[in-house]
Curated annotation (Swiss-Prot):
PANTHER family: 30S/40S RIBOSOMAL PROTEIN S3, SMALL RIBOSOMAL SUBUNIT PROTEIN US3C. Residues 39-107 form the KH type-2 domain. CDD domains: KH-II_30S_S3. This is Small ribosomal subunit protein uS3. It comes from Aliivibrio fischeri (strain ATCC 700601 / ES114) (Vibrio fischeri). One of its GO terms (molecular function) is structural constituent of ribosome. Keywords: Ribonucleoprotein, Ribosomal protein, RNA-binding, rRNA-binding. Transmembrane segments: none annotated. GO terms for biological process: translation. Part of the 30S ribosomal subunit. Forms a tight complex with proteins S10 and S14.
Length: 232
């Protein structure tokens, strides 16, 4: 039976960047990894209402640099930068090194997989009909230029006794094409009937020229063999 690989993991280094870019010795690696996990946990908890897309962590020379991708940068920064300064102090305390926080704005939240999944989950928690929430997300993404989108929800939909999965797709979502830029994200809605899982795949187009042309080695053509002339 065929199984689905994680769409982001299989594309790392091809069309997808890493969410953490640092190198460490074997002695420091576990501490850094644990620090990353705690920093992400802290920021996700503090920025619940800030439409958080992703968190990128870098560790240049005895410090930590965190880039927060959000659709609402004003909520993260706060009045006169008070909130971002509080976040910086919190991250520095967790990591144990000086911290720097950068804010990157997500221009089109309707085309960001994580934001779409979180939006559907919050609507389900507000008792919006799941089909309406799914259809609205699909229509908004296609209207803003997505090549394709698939949304799946699973659980006790509509308070049903038996859990089931339902999905809605429009356009193309080529999971086997490695050069396809597919934004995959998951979220969960905590309703009175239980937890409903949300999965979103957004196909934004193919990334051509991923490998530089200079690195591509062309096979050498065989030289035509010269015919020997017979001596008279």
């Amino acid at each position: 039976m065929g199984q689905k690989v994680h769409p982001n993991g299989i594309r790392l280094g091809i069309v997808k960047p890493w969410n953490a870019t640092w190198f460490a010795s074997s002695q420091e690696f576990a501490d850094n990894l644990d620090g990353d996990f705690k920093v992400r946990q802290y920021l996700t908890k503090e920025l619940k209402k800030a439409s958080l897309s992703r968190i990128v962590i870098e560790r240049p020379a005895k410090s930590i640099r965190v880039t927060i991708h959000t659709a609402r940068p004003g909520v993260v920064i706060g009045k006169k930068g008070e909130d971002v300064e509080k976040l910086r102090a919190g991250v520095a305390k967790i990591a144990g090194v000086p911290a720097q926080i950068n804010i990157a704005e997500v221009r089109k939240p309707e085309l960001d997989g994580q934001l779409v999944a979180d939006s559907i989950a919050s609507q389900l928690e507000r008792r919006v009909m799941f089909r309406r929430a799914m259809k609205r997300a699909v229509q908004n993404a296609m209207r803003l230029g997505a090549k394709g989108i698939k949304v799946e929800v699973s659980g006790r939909l509509g308070g049903a006794e038996i859990a089931r999965s339902e999905w809605y797709r429009e356009g193309r979502v080529p999971l086997h094409t490695l050069r396809a830029d597919i934004d995959y994200a998951t979220s969960s809605a905590h309703t009175q009937y239980g937890v409903i899982g949300v999965k979103v795949w957004i196909f934004k187009g193919e990334v051509l020229g991923g490998m530089p042309a200079a690195n591509a080695v062309e096979p050498k053509a065989d030289k035509p063999k010269k015919q020997r002339r017979s001596r008279k």
